[in-house]
Amino acid sequence: MAAIQGIEGVISQLQATAMAARGQDTHSQSTVSFAGQLHAALDRISDRQTAARVQAEKFTLGEPGIALNDVMADMQKASVSMQMGIQVRNKLVAAYQEVMSMQV
């Protein structure tokens, strides 16, 4: 969590510098934080995995209206979402490490 806070701090400093260079007030920036966006994305990934698991359980129990192709498609969507989340995390960690290794 400290890495996310560090990245968020660097991003907010860069945004403030960019706004100051453009002559804008730094207090008028949006209130959506990087950590908030990241948390929302992780929640969506979790929701997609939960929905796929529930649908697979319903199919296994033989509930009517649940087709195998729908279950497989939802499970694949959940898998792709998870892989995307892992890749985003890897890119964030690499960017954070690069910023931290910069000399001031």
Swiss-Prot record:
InterPro entries: FliE (IPR001624). It is found in: Bacterial flagellum basal body. It comes from the Bacteria. GO terms for molecular function: cytoskeletal motor activity; structural molecule activity. Belongs to the FliE family. HAMAP family: FliE (MF_00724). This is Flagellar hook-basal body complex protein FliE. It comes from Salmonella paratyphi B (strain ATCC BAA-1250 / SPB7). The gene is fliE.
